[in-house]
Amino acid sequence: CSESEKFAHITFFLNGGTNESFPCESHVRIPSPKGVPFDQVPELSLPAVADEVIKGLETGYDCIITNFANGDVIGHTASAEAKIRCAEVVDYHLGRVIEAAKEQGYVVLITADHGNLEEMLTPDGKPNVAHTTNLVPFLFIDPLTSQTIQPADGSLQDIAPTLLNILGV
């Protein structure tokens, strides 16, 4: 589940460069806001994305993959106010999803492929609108132990094997 602005990140890219759904896979695309600058709607369509993910958790899918597009999309704007609001909105809706996942017994993995929102200004004091090279967190939340684990090292290449291991594949 993702909004349209970053939908390819959890479909086309994750499925090896194809737009086709695999058997037992469903794609949920929530339309991103149209006709308004993104810095004026830092929540984008996240409330609807989170609602859809929570519905999926209650349905009992084996695995749900989602993209909260806000940090990346709003991070490319020059508005500090929009970036702050974006972080607040993501925090709130991520909390909703994590609580629902825990209630349903899901393991939760949280990460990003790059930084963006965390640096408001460039070294010369201008608004930063580019990706950063800062390390991003990887959180593993286990509902059975109520533990959140944050490994000290790892990379994006470790995510798929970790997920497959959790799924018993």
Regions found by a protein language model. Give the residues of each.
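Feature captures the catalytic ectodomains and active-site-proximal regions of enzymes
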Residues: 1-169
